[in-house]
Amino acid sequence: FKEDDLLEGTAQPLEDILPQVLAELAPYQEKYGRDIPVFVAGGGLTGEDMARFRGMGAAGVQIATRLIATEECDASQGYKDAILRARGEDVRIIHSPVGMPGRAIYSPLIARMEAGQRQAPQWCAGCIKTCDPAQTPYCITHALIRAVEGDWEEGLFFCGAEVGQVNEMSTVAQVLAEYQAALAQR
């Protein structure tokens, strides 16, 4: 999605995009006699979401935010707590130092960036070619590591749009059981 579409709320929903992608792939599947699996990403939070997208022809659904709040996730409890505390209005579209938009939980780091404060990187790993350490407002590598470690002040806590619906810890088995039950009912 383009950043402006995300900020203005005009990005096409996956329910509109998926049929278009499947239609574009159909001639190639026929020509080469091979199935080309399509996975949707973004918006697959519940079992009902999973069943809906699978029913529309998706081979699968990438899930992320929901799995952060599981016992098995290796992120710190601080990151998990940030996910569990977040409400819908806490989600911001940020312009990352790598030049792409992303959804993140509003945190002190984002507040500082919105106020125009720059946190010059203390070191550079050279991880992204498009990042200029002399100009970047903050080091995304540092901010992501701080988030995984649970540092609320310095972390960049990426999340999905529906993070406000994730309000309790669970296990991966519980999440997958919910998805399987929803798929079995369709």
Language model region names:
Residues 1-39, 45-186:
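Conserved active-site-proximal phosphate/metal-binding subdomains
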